Each structure stands twice: as structure tokens, then as C-alpha cells.
Regions:
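N-terminal active-site segment of His-dependent metallophosphoesterases
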Residues: 1-69
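His/Asp/Glu-rich metal-coordinating catalytic cores
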Residues: 49, 58-166
């Protein structure tokens, strides 16, 4: 079984801090093309799943172009399961603009959510589980104590963000 893991792609980033408008536009296109190439490569290689561990986008205001390209890529590859954990830069940005989610797009929430990768069962009937949670200021202090995994499965845990520690 083959799985692709990625994070911090930051599609639709303004890139205005260090680049000219022309270079920023060029880089923005390159990022979207690279994401397309990754998905195409996955399909060609028989990848079962693509795990996106946060910050697929860089803004809450995703362009229609980027949203449609990503949605069409996901829908156009129904044999690949996409597991999308939103990060601190893309909360709700992609999914809020969709009238309905592609069937092969699996999302995580503020509580632990697990999905079993189909076709990965071992002799005991257990397979690969992809488990994740979107960290928030409200859950980040206690969520780790609530993780429960099946020891008979191969478990992949997906998180994004670092914990902010405050002194004083």
C-alpha cells in the first residue's frame, strides 16, 4: 500500500512579502501545478491515500480557481482517499466554498476522528486507521489524553500546529 503525506503547501498564498507581484503570481501558479503533479503521480503509482496534514491553503479566502482545481483533482481521482486536516491558515477556507464534498474527501474535526483505509485489512480483519484532530486553543491542552487507538491496527495519527506555551 502506498500513501502520500503532505502539509504546509499554502496554495493561494499572496507571497507579497518578498516577491514582486509578477513573481508572486508565478510562484502561486507553480504551487498549484505542483499539487496537481503530486496527485497525478499518486494516481500513476497506485497510491491508496493522500494525507494532507494542514495548511493546504494559506488564506480563509480561497480563490475560485484554486478551490475548483483542488475539488476537481479530488473528484477526478475516486480511487484515492484524501484525508484533509485543516491547519491554522486554512480553517474552513476550502470546504466552506463547496456545495457538497467529494465522496473520497475525509475531514477531521475538533474531536478525534478515525477512518479505516479500505482494502488494507490483515488476517485478523484489521487494517490501517487514519486518525486526526484539528487543534484549537480550547482542545489543545486536553485532547492528547483522549486519543484511543486499536493496537491491532496500523495507526496513522495526523496533527497540525505547534502548541503555544505561555510563561507567566
Amino acid at each position: 500500500m502506498k500513501i502520500i503525506h503532505c502539509a504546509d503547501i499554502h496554495l493561494d498564498s499572496k507571497m507579497s512579502a518578498n516577491l514582486t507581484k509578477e513573481k508572486a503570481r508565478e510562484r502561486k501558479t507553480e504551487l498549484l501545478t505542483t499539487f496537481q503533479n503530486m496527485v497525478t503521480y499518486g494516481a500513476e503509482q497506485g497510491v491508496a491515500a493522500i494525507i494532507i496534514a494542514g495548511d493546504l491553503f494559506d488564506t480563509k479566502n480561497v480563490s475560485a480557481t484554486a478551490r475548483n482545481v483542488v475539488k476537481d483533482l479530488i473528484q477526478g481521482h475516486p480511487k484515492i482517499a484524501f484525508y484533509y486536516l485543516q491547519g491554522n491558515h486554512d480553517e474552513g477556507s476550502f470546504t466552506s466554498g463547496l456545495s457538497e464534498l467529494p465522496e473520497n474527501l475525509h475531514l477531521f474535526g475538533n474531536n478525534w476522528t478515525s477512518y479505516e483505509l479500505s482494502g488494507t485489512e490483515n488476517t485478523s480483519g484489521k487494517g490501517v486507521a487514519v486518525t486526526g484532530v484539528e487543534l484549537t486553543p480550547e482542545n489543545s491542552g486536553s485532547i492528547y489524553n483522549t486519543l484511543s487507538l486499536d493496537v491491532d491496527q496500523c495507526n496513522i495519527v495526523v496533527l497540525h500546529r505547534s502548541e503555544e506555551r505561555r510563561v507567566g
